[in-house]
Amino acid sequence: MVDRALADPAVRRALVPVVFGDGPTFERRATLRRLPVVAPGTALPPEGPARVAVTELPARDRAPGKPTTNGGKAQLAYVTAAVDSALRGEVDALCTAPVSKEQITRAGVRFMGHTELLAEAFGREVLMLMDGPRVKVALATNHVAIRDLPRSLEKSRLAAQLQLLSASLQPVLGRRPRIAVCGLNPHAGEGGLLGDEEIRTIAPAIALARRRGVDCTGPWPADGLFARPDHMPADVVLAMFHDQALVVAKALDFERTVNVTLGLPVPRTSPDHGVAYALAGKGKASATPMIAALLKAAQLASPRGRASRRATSTPRPRA
């Protein structure tokens, strides 16, 4: 999937890729795609045809479609190496391929996802945004069990997320974005009959964000808000939990919706799908999501994207 995406003409015009992964495996795939590969450490041209630098990491299990403990360790090693490179200022953006949280955890490391790892590595408060052609929806919580959602929502944090979302999109839109905020419960709580998180937490957070200059409304019942995505009275939605956001984003445009991490000093994007082990090594997986993620990373690394990040990179408070 990665090799096919990097061979795409639009991607080759847009960026110079540096691949963090298993060298021999990628070199073999790159040869099939006629992608030029340069040795690790070789200076890459700032312009011209895209070239690929393969980072040498210890060889791991190379059995496509077969999850292994060593494979989990390798996935984490590749992600960590890419993040370290970004921290050193060696790359302008990060585009992460899917990894298996289960296999990484089985390898002995509790891994909740790229977004959480990046927040910790950069020491920033971040926000996950599913950026699609028809709807943009951010997540107030990421990988949180349903039973833990009520205590995961906090007024000041929600207000800060709304500020981050507004500041991130304003340079792109040229104005303050209109943000619609979902409720947590069915029918946004129905006035407290179906839960009171909207009354106790979400509505006060919206009021606080509005006092800070954010154009936001809600809490709205999610089913009604997403019923007509092409006529939504907002530029972006803040959803309260993972599936409230991702079901809509994937249903509307699975292949072209990109996962963007807001709040980092460098852009980070990812395709909106998982590892798909059943398709690994068969050439059947669509490269369109990875192409979309790569092009979005290049766009966010542009001067306008850099201006947006300068306005939104907020250090996380030290404990």
Question: How should these model regions be labeled?
Answer:
Residues 117, 128, 137-139, 268:
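Conserved hydrophobic/aromatic beta-strand scaffold that supports enzyme active sites
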Residues 105-128:
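Glycine/threonine-rich beta-strand-loop-alpha-helix active-site module
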Residues 56-59, 124-127, 131-134:
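Flexible glycine-/small-residue-enriched beta->alpha junction loops
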